């Protein structure tokens, strides 16, 4: 059993223990008869005899200690819920307003087209025309990327840019000799076609992706490049990517980064990828656009962006102290006074994790790394001299505290622990505005920026309820720097040619797994707990009726606990 499963099992056992005590105390479960028979050897009717004293003791303890303690948690969650809904409303409102007024980066930052067109035309015009283009390096970090290495290398080699002004650097950290050989042969094939493509390896994987990017910047040929674009192994930029991004950097000397938006080649493959699309579309449409439009802060997404080399060096270069090296560099560059540009209409194709396990590992890495970076950067942000106080508040409060800590905490503690337990603790008070109105408001503001994903938003809410368990565990691991806080597991890809031409049916068949090997114990445990609480609420009506929501949450945990969401074509999956 992994550490995460053990932690989930402990959480379930604690919640189940509280539920059992509450159920016994209210009379839903009565073991007095069994206690009396065993202790006295006599037949006594349930509910009578000497065993009733401990029930009364528990009721007293519940009203004097348990309920007050949980009530503190309730009000803490209410405060966090308000923080969360205000943050979401602000992001959605700003992004909608920016769209309505036609806000575009070109209005605030100078942009002029380069020359007369693409690389082929520049070759005809000669060296004089090509000299107008700055030296650009494109980095493609990869690790055992058998399924996608050709896609990314081919797409990057198709970028429109003078060949003599472009260096393509494939940073291969693969440990599989067969895959390394294939990647190297692919690079040699493109080099034979006249492209300046470099195949770079290193001994060991120190620093993981950050270490590879840092090592790549140390090569002599890299030092002559003014700008560096980064694409993960599953990303496929359009040919005009550099033509649309680099001019912003050339004409605005205070701009360090131009970030593009992600789109997905496998978003219709399964319910899992559809829900991921809903989440990421909101991130790009609301959070990234709001941070860009207000000149506050938005983070580098780790790929599909172009950096000014000077800014990378000024910020201290790539660091491997967390699993979110992209966010780390973005924050440090911002504190140095550099500005970022987000281009929401420039889209780069990529691949979503197609299995639940892969998605959980990706989200753990992102959540743990973000929380850990929050811990490491608090003082640096507070003492920074080149950013305003408002930007410091935005970075620490909005970007880090609310999104990295508050969001997973309130989602799990309130909706998966406190509300279920409350159906068996009548002394607990839950304000209706906190458990009904705020979730509804969050649903609405999310739907406003996701109209094309409206049908998946309710499912996304249930899915996020499950994922909050993993994100909260990751946030705690990052904040406390537990043993697993700096683990890096590469997200498994399958390649978009693993699906049919309509991007709907998986063609790659996976070997059949035994049911026991597919079970996720924390999810199954929480599903049992939630369904028990829902059934208790249905049978023994209290002052609140949460059983419908609890049944839905329990079903969501159960399906994900059996890995029934994702691309497992051999099984009954959605």
From Swiss-Prot:
GO BP of this protein: cell wall organization
Entry EC number(s): 2.4.1.32
Listed transmembrane segments: 66-86, 405-425, 428-448, 521-541, 546-566
Keyword Transferase: yes
Catalytic machinery residues: 173, 326
One GO cellular component term: Golgi membrane
Gene3D superfamilies membership: Spore Coat Polysaccharide Biosynthesis Protein SpsA, Chain A (3.90.550.10)
Topology in membrane: Multi-pass membrane protein
GO molecular function: glucomannan 4-beta-mannosyltransferase activity; mannan synthase activity
UniProt cross-references to InterPro entries, sorted A to Z: Glyco_trans_2-like, Nucleotide-diphossugar_trans
Family the UniProt entry places it in: Belongs to the glycosyltransferase 2 family. Plant cellulose synthase-like A subfamily.
Record-given protein name: Probable glucomannan 4-beta-mannosyltransferase 5
């Amino acid at each position: 059993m992994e550490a995460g499963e053990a932690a989930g099992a402990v959480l379930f056992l604690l919640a189940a223990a509280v539920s059992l005590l509450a159920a016994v105390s209210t009379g839903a479960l009565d073991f007095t008869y069994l206690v009396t028979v065993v202790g006295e050897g006599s037949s006594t009717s349930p509910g009578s005899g000497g065993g009733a004293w401990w029930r009364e003791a528990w009721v007293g303890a519940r009203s004097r200690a348990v309920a007050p303690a949980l009530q503190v948690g309730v009000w803490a969650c209410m405060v966090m819920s308000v923080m969360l809904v205000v943050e979401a409303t602000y992001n959605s409102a700003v992004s909608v307003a920016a769209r309505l007024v036609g806000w575009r980066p070109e209005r605030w930052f100078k942009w002029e087209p380069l020359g007369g067109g693409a690389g082929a035309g520049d070759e005809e015009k000669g060296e004089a025309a090509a000299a107008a283009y700055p030296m650009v390096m494109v980095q493609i970090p990869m690790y055992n990327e058998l399924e996608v290495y050709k896609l990314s290398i081919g797409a990057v080699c198709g970028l429109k840019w003078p060949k003599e002004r472009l260096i393509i650097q494939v940073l291969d950290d693969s440990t599989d000799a067969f895959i390394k050989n294939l990647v190297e042969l692919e690079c040699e094939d493109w080099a034979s076609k006249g492209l300046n493509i470099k195949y770079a390896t290193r001994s060991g994987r120190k620093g993981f992706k950050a270490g590879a990017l840092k090592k790549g910047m140390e090569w002599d040929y890299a030092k002559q490049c003014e700008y560096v674009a980064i694409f993960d192994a599953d990303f496929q930029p359009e040919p005009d990517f550099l033509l649309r991004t680099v001019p912003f950097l050339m004409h605005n000397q205070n701009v360090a980064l131009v970030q593009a938006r992600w789109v997905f080649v496998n978003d219709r493959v399964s319910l899992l990828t559809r829900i991921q699309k809903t989440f990421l579309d909101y991130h790009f449409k609301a959070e990234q656009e709001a941070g860009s439009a207000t000149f506050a802060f938005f983070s580098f997404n780790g790929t599909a962006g172009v950096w000014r080399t000077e800014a990378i060096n000024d910020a201290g270069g790539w660091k491997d102290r967390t699993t979110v090296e992209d966010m780390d560099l973005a924050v440090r560059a911002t504190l140095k006074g550099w500005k970022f540009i987000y281009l929401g209409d420039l889209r780069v194709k990529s691949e979503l994790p197609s299995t639940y396990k892969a998605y959980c590992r990706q989200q753990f890495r992102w959540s743990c790394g973000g929380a850990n970076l929050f811990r490491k950067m608090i003082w640096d942000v507070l003492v920074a001299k080149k950013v305003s106080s408002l930007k410091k508040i935005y970075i620490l409060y909005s970007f880090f505290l609310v999104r990295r800590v508050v969001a997973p905490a309130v989602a799990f503690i309130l909706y998966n622990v406190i509300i279920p337990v409350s159906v068996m603790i009548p002394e607990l008070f839950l304000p209706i505005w906190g458990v009904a109105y705020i979730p509804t408001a969050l649903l609405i503001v999310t739907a406003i920026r996701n109209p094309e994903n409206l049908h998946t938003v309710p499912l996304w809410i249930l899915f996020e309820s499950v994922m909050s368990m993993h994100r909260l565990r990751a946030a705690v691991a990052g904040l406390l720097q537990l043993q697993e806080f700096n683990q890096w597991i590469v997200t498994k890809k399958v390649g978009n040619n693993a699906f049919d031409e309509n991007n709907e049916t998986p063609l790659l068949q996976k070997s059949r797994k035994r049911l026991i090997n597919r079970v996720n114990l924390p999810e199954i445990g929480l599903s049992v707990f939630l369904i028990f609480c829902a059934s208790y609420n249905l049978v023994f009506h209290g002052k609140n009726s949460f059983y419908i929501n609890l049944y839905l949450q329990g079903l969501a945990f159960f399906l994900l606990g059996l890995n029934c969401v994702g691309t497992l074509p051999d099984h009954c999956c959605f």
